[in-house]
Amino acid sequence: MGRFLTTTALALLATGGAATARPIRACDVSTKYLITFGDSYSQTGFDVTGTKPSASNPLGNPLLPGWTASGGLNWVGFLVSEFNTSTTLSYNFAYGGATTNATIVPPYQPTVLSFIDQVAQFSGSIARKPDYAPWNADNALFGVWIGVNDVGNVWWDPNYDSLLEQIMESYFGQLQILYDAGARNFVLLSVPPIQRTPAVLLNNSPENQKAEALAVDKYNEALAANLEAFTDKNGGITAKIVDTGVPFNTALDNPTDYGAPDATCYNSDGKSCLWFNDYHPGIEINRLVAQAVADAWKGSFF
């Protein structure tokens, strides 16, 4: 039986402080691997066939901060450049617009790579632990942050509960593939309070906002329940859920503490408002999310 923990404790959130990272140095035995999957909240534009991550270039391609939807670094970039305590290399398969399974919840374009497609990319590349990415069960942390588009695209559907069961079956089917490839450390990020995005607040009635919030809660409850079953089934796992609602709400409830005039403005500079656009968090919220992940794995990966 594996270890399953849910973490909401964010010791540094009150000040928004960042952990001090050791300088990135040449690859050595302490090198760690952050292997991630998700949607635009996680994407950095990485192409596994391009320049590979290295000690001096932890994202590989594009260079830091990558091609993100935050206006700068997102949570992945922060983890490998500011919260790392040793060389940490990012293999980020996340793709903007992704859903878990495109046959259950279609993405906005058919060319979008779903979580299933992303895991297939992993399986066809670094799953075999090539010389350029010699990850193993101890030095690799697998991160998944998906569900924003799953919930956002179908929260209103009268068959939402049934769809959610199908989504979770697909989600944990992909985790099983990763486990079978040797993954043992998993961090799953919950769906944040998307009902607080400017897009939802401006375009939905209070009743619909409450309904979407309920759909988010149902998703996150299902995520926790399915992870517990997954760790019971598979041995040697350390798995943690990071409740992204905590960093989001911390910033949104205290916008001026994070350099924004209010909780609903957005700006593509990613800095002067909490939101990059009307649906994507800017740099400060991403920093807080990264901090939450780092705190959850303090002493082992960060």
UniProtKB/Swiss-Prot annotation:
Protein known as: Acetylesterase
Subcellular location: Secreted
Role description: Acetyl esterase that acts as an exo-deacetylase. Liberates acetic acid from xylo-oligomers.
InterPro entries, A to Z: GDSL, GDSL_lipolytic_enzyme, SGNH_hydro_sf
Protein species of origin: Thermothelomyces thermophilus
Family the UniProt entry places it in: Belongs to the carbohydrate esterase CE16 family.
Coiled-coil zones: none
SUPFAM superfamilies: SGNH hydrolase
Catalytic activity: an acetyl ester + H2O = an aliphatic alcohol + acetate + H(+)
One GO cellular component term: extracellular region
Enzyme class: hydrolase
